[in-house]
């Protein structure tokens, strides 16, 4: 489901539901997920590309019964990870912008395991590339990323950034329970 109208039909209270009303209060915002990778990779022109993709998409929230109840994410086990390869993990600016957007916009943010340590994976190579084990936790693991002191400098910066942002969000009711105001 890669357009908001198709997704909205599945949310409880949707005026677009075909037969009867679905009882799902929360649905996954796959259209937003598909835009996130592009939005933070492209230059934003005047009314096109880049972050305008997000602006334009959010302006269409009226199709949802409750946009605040959408599950929003940059990646999951059925998609390529936000970082599809090792080279992309070097761009922490892209990571910080995307994570900040996810944790401050409307909806219920979901972070896929490994995002905090910049795990990467390309779905086109197979499910195993996006569902790799988190490093650590087993005696045979050569690296234990459950302990922040075992992270490399880039992973540590990403980890501490997301931890700080999540702690800030936790203590900020307007971010977690407020509403989104869309301005032109």
Language model feature labels by segment:
Residues 104-105, 116:
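Conserved beta-strand->loop/alpha-helix structural units within folded catalytic cores of enzymes
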Residues 67-90:
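Active-site clefts of carbohydrate-active enzymes
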Residues 66-70, 106-110:
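Loop/turn elements at helix/coil->beta-strand transitions in domains of secreted/extracellular proteins
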Residues 1, 72, 111-113:
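Hydrophobic faces of well-ordered beta-strands that scaffold small-molecule active sites
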Residues 95-97:
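Conserved interdomain hinge at the start of the Helicase C-terminal
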Residues 175-184:
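Surface beta-strand/loop "capping" patches
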Residues 1-64, 91-92, 101, 118-168, ...:
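Active-site-proximal helices and loops of the catalytic beta/alpha 8
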Residues 71, 99-100:
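Active-site phosphate/pyrophosphate- and oxyanion-stabilizing loops and adjacent acidic/basic residues
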């Amino acid at each position: 489901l890669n357009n908001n109208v198709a997704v909205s039909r599945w949310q409880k209270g949707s005026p677009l539901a075909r037969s009867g009303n679905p009882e799902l209060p929360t649905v996954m915002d796959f259209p937003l997920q598909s835009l996130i990778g592009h939005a933070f990779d492209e230059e934003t022109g005047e009314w096109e590309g880049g972050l305008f993709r997000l602006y334009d998409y959010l302006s269409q929230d009226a199709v949802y019964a409750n946009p605040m109840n959408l599950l929003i994410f940059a990646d999951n086990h059925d998609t390529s990870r936000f970082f599809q390869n090792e080279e992309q993990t070097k761009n922490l600016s892209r990571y910080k912008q995307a994570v900040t957007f996810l944790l401050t916009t409307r909806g219920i943010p979901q972070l896929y395991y490994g995002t905090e340590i910049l795990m990467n994976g390309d779905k086109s190579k197979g499910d195993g590339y996006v569902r790799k084990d988190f490093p650590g936790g087993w005696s045979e693991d050569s690296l234990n990323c459950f302990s922040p002191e075992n992270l490399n400098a880039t992973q540590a910066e990403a980890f501490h950034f997301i931890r700080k942002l999540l702690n800030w969000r936790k203590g900020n009711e307007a971010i977690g329970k407020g509403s989104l105001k869309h301005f032109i």
